[in-house]
Regions:
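A short gly/proline-enriched turn/hairpin at secondary-structure junctions
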Residues: 28-42, 50-51
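Hydrophobic/anchoring residues in structured secondary elements
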Residues: 35, 64-66, 101
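Surface-exposed, charged secondary-structure patches
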Residues: 44-92
Length: 107
């Protein structure tokens, strides 16, 4: 990571993505976690399998605020190549209860 993420659950999620560790990814989430991509709610499991784990996915954080609760990253997978993305996380009891992601504007 080139930017500092200090929230342990967010660190764990990023590490899981970069290691291709599906179990660790879901362990960083609450059981009822939800997500949206480009403003549309998605089935989290289906989305993660398609976007992060079938590819394989990589995530390089470029900038982060609020301990990583809001960040800009370069995401890479075999389907879409490299995209500049935003991520916003909501935490509950030390885990991620929701994240919103989508394409970010140019740097």
């Amino acid at each position: 990571m080139t930017a500092e993420v200090t929230e342990p659950a967010i660190q764990a999620l990023i590490h899981a993505i970069n290691e291709g560790d599906r179990s660790a990814f879901f362990a960083a989430l609450t059981p009822d976690a939800s997500m949206s991509d480009d403003g549309r709610d998605r089935d989290l499991t289906q989305w993660a399998d398609r976007e992060l784990f079938s590819g394989p996915g990589r995530m390089e954080v470029k900038s982060a605020t609020d301990g990583g609760r809001s960040l800009i990253a370069e995401n890479t997978n075999d389907t879409y190549g490299t995209m500049r993305t935003f991520w916003r996380f909501t935490l509950r009891d030390g885990k991620i209860s929701r994240y919103e992601t989508g394409q970010a504007g140019p740097a």
